[in-house]
Amino acid sequence: MPELPEVETVKRGLAPTMEGALLVRAELRRPDLRFPFPENFEDAVAGRRIVALSRRAKYLTIELEGGDVIIAHLGMSGSFRIEFDGPGEGRIKESADPAVPGDFHRPRSKDEKHDHVVFHLDASCGPARVIYNDPRRFGFMALARREALAEHVFLRGLGEEPTGNALDAAYLAARFSGKAQPLKAALLDQRTIAGLGNIYVCEALWRSGLSPKRAAGTLVDKRARPKQALVQLTDAIRAVIADAIAAGGSSLKDHIQADGSLGYFQHSFSVYDREGEACRTSGCRGTVERIVQAGRSTFYCPHCQK
């Protein structure tokens, strides 16, 4: 499932084409994805200019002129691509570095089997199509008003973003104080950190030398202040997310960028999906193990993560 860095990468790839463009019409090729599309979705968004693209946790938001906002979730296998309706000056850009999000767009191609939504745009570079493809159909789209966005059923109750200054050790100490819950489960709670998923929790715990099985409350002292280990964990979370965004996310099964290229952070994994391989901590002679926590795979080194 695409996590925060993947969705951020998609947002950055779509924004140069979509922001400021006129959404001429939305074409729905089926009545639903994971959930039914909002009633009159096509009519509600047609003829509206796109003001801005943003991201909240693992959700992409597309703000339209007039205050309506499209909320999109990629589910397990969803992806966007940008295609232009014909050759023309400035419509197709190629970069020496195709991994840069948004620097490469494709000419129009034949429709693919799982192209379920097509946004037809009048963009600054000419007519374009932004196509949502989702083989498993676990993604979904919803509509909300800008002023009520934070309280939308999909967004309300989300915790702090791991990319902002609000996520610090004091914040996590307040959330973890007195908790016997395993550290990994506490970090995956979207009410604590919005958008943080399985891959990047494993990587952050390895970077900070902490066991995923350790009780979250052990990182907080008796006065509910963060111990140094929690400070290090907070720094590791922010760093691993920043590194993953810079690498364009991780391409494991289904994630591709809006330009059709792959993310590269999976080549930097230190523990995730490395069961049985040597730990990459300097001087550590341990090997990466896989355990299951709450039905999900956890990868860690029991030798150096305590």
From Swiss-Prot:
SMART domains: Fapy_DNA_glyco (SM00898), H2TH (SM01232). PROSITE patterns: FPG_CAT (PS51068), ZF_FPG_2 (PS51066). Its cofactor is Zn(2+). One of its GO terms (biological process) is base-excision repair. The active site is at 2 (schiff-base intermediate with dna), 3 (proton donor), 58 (proton donor), 296 (proton donor). A zinc finger (FPG-type) spans 270-306. InterPro entries: DNA_glyclase/AP_lyase_DNA-bd, Formamido-pyr_DNA_Glyclase, FPG_cat, MutM-like_N-ter, Ribosomal_uS13-like_H2TH, Znf_DNA_glyclase/AP_lyase, Znf_FPG/IleRS. Binds 1 zinc ion per subunit. It comes from the Bacteria. The keyword Zinc applies. DNA binds at residues 114, 136, 179. One of its GO terms (molecular function) is zinc ion binding. Its EC number is 3.2.2.23, 4.2.99.18. Keywords: DNA damage, DNA repair, DNA-binding, Glycosidase, Hydrolase, Lyase, Metal-binding, Multifunctional enzyme, Zinc, Zinc-finger. PANTHER family: FORMAMIDOPYRIMIDINE-DNA GLYCOSYLASE. NCBIfam families: PRK01103.1. Belongs to the FPG family. Monomer. Involved in base excision repair of DNA damaged by oxidation or by mutagenic agents. Acts as a DNA glycosylase that recognizes and removes damaged bases. Has a preference for oxidized purines, such as 7,8-dihydro-8-oxoguanine (8-oxoG). Has AP (apurinic/apyrimidinic) lyase activity and introduces nicks in the DNA strand. Cleaves the DNA backbone by beta-delta elimination to generate a single-strand break at the site of the removed base with both 3'- and 5'-phosphates. This is Formamidopyrimidine-DNA glycosylase. It comes from Sinorhizobium medicae (strain WSM419) (Ensifer medicae). The gene is mutM.
